Amino acid sequence: MSNDDHGPMIDIDKLIHEPARLMIMAQLYVVEEADFIFLMRQTGLTWGNLSSHMSKLEEAEYIEVRKEFLDKKPHTILKLTQKGRDAFTEYRRNIDQVFKDLPD
């Protein structure tokens, strides 16, 4: 592969590619929305780690974070935005292409 022909690896979204954020994005891609505790359990991330990665995804406008009260307790809901859904779809396409381009 020449320097001019990097293929799909050059197009991999580094924000999504980080393992913790990849888990968050994958979970949210499948469900309409999820609460913070559900994502903690599904990803195995600590409160602080999930919160940190959630902030980065929110800054990129890949997720929407809604805070509400449920039985007088704070409740955080996360949802993929259309931009996030499109970015994840493109990420999957690029990763698939990387593997297809590998020799047998």
Model-derived regions, located:
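Amphipathic alpha-helical dimerization/coiled-coil segments
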Residues: M1-M9, A26, R85-D104
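Glycine-centered, phosphate/nucleic-acid-interacting loop/turn motifs that mediate DNA/RNA or nucleotide
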Residues: E61
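Accessory beta->alpha helical hairpin/"wing" motif in late/C-terminal subdomains of nucleic-acid enzymes
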Residues: L80-G84
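N-terminal helix-turn-helix DNA-binding core of bacterial DNA-binding proteins
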Residues: P8-N49, E68-D71, H75-K79
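Short beta-strand "wing" residues that participate in macromolecule-binding interfaces
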Residues: V65
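Short, hydrophobic-biased segments on the C-terminal half of alpha helices
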Residues: M54-S55
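Surface-exposed beta-strand edges and their flanking turn/coil or helix-capping segments
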Residues: I37-L39, S51, I77-L78, Y91-I95, ...
